């Protein structure tokens, strides 16, 4: 997808997986990016991870709790996926699940075989070290429950939104309108990392439709930047 600032129009080319064009280029006045951000896993790097002899995967790849039966499993990340997978692993026979949190413990009434540990610092083969100077030995598998990253390789570089997942990502007025290029005609839907996902999708879709139809008048660029920054910094 490219933008011609002189014509103020976008050109979209579609290819199949073999890199062959399957449709002639199409031209548009607005671009709505609604491909989501739950497809490219976020894999943080930890010293010594390459020495770990067991299985390492992301929650995106998790399919069957029975695969971890009889194992001691470390879950890096204590949000929704970490909580769910820990409970499922224990329910279906895991020996122990260690949930590693980044800032504060969840405080949940876990089953007896689930324990919480603070930030992971480094790994020495099957021994995991934590920020409170404790360690856990003989870990069999590590599951990263560390979210996803926005990945939009199909967008022109100047129009590609770059941000870690957050409640209110930068550069998006009203959480939708990209303010750094495209003459205020590029909109990203669903970039927020929130609990009420589908309700948010509906609201963003309504706002986007009204904006494209001309029912919403934008403030000056400086005001839009001030607006999204005030939300992003909360």
Task: Tell what function each PLM region has.
Residues 1-225:
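Flavin (primarily FAD) cofactor-binding/catalytic cores of flavoenzymes
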Residues 223-234:
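Mid-to-C-terminal Rossmann-like scaffold of FAD/NAD(P)H-dependent oxidoreductases
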């Amino acid at each position: 997808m490219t933008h011609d600032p002189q014509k103020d129009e976008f050109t979209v080319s579609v290819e199949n997986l073999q890199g062959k064009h399957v449709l002639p280029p199409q031209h548009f006045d607005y671009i709505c990016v609604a491909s989501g951000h739950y497809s490219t896993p976020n894999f943080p790097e930890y010293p010594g991870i390459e020495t770990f002899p067991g299985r390492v995967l992301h929650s995106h790849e998790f399919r069957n709790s029975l695969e971890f039966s009889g194992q001691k499993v470390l879950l890096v990340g204590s949000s929704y996926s970490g909580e769910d997978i820990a409970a499922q692993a224990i329910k279906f026979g895991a020996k122990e699940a260690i949930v590693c949190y980044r800032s504060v413990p969840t405080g949940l009434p876990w089953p007896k075989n689930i324990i919480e540990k603070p930030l992971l610092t480094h790994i020495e083969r099957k021994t995991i070290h934590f920020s409170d100077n404790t360690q856990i030995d003989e870990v069999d598998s590590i599951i990263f429950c560390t979210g996803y990253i926005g990945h939009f390789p199909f967008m022109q570089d100047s129009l590609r939104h770059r941000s870690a997942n957050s409640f209110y990502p930068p550069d998006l007025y009203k959480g939708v309108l990209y303010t750094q290029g495209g003459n205020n005609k590029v909109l990203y839907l669903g970039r927020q990392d929130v609990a009420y996902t589908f309700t948010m999708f509906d609201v963003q879709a309504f706002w986007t439709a009204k904006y494209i139809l001309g029912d919403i008048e934008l403030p000056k660029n400086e005001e839009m930047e001030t607006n999204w920054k005030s939300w992003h910094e909360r």
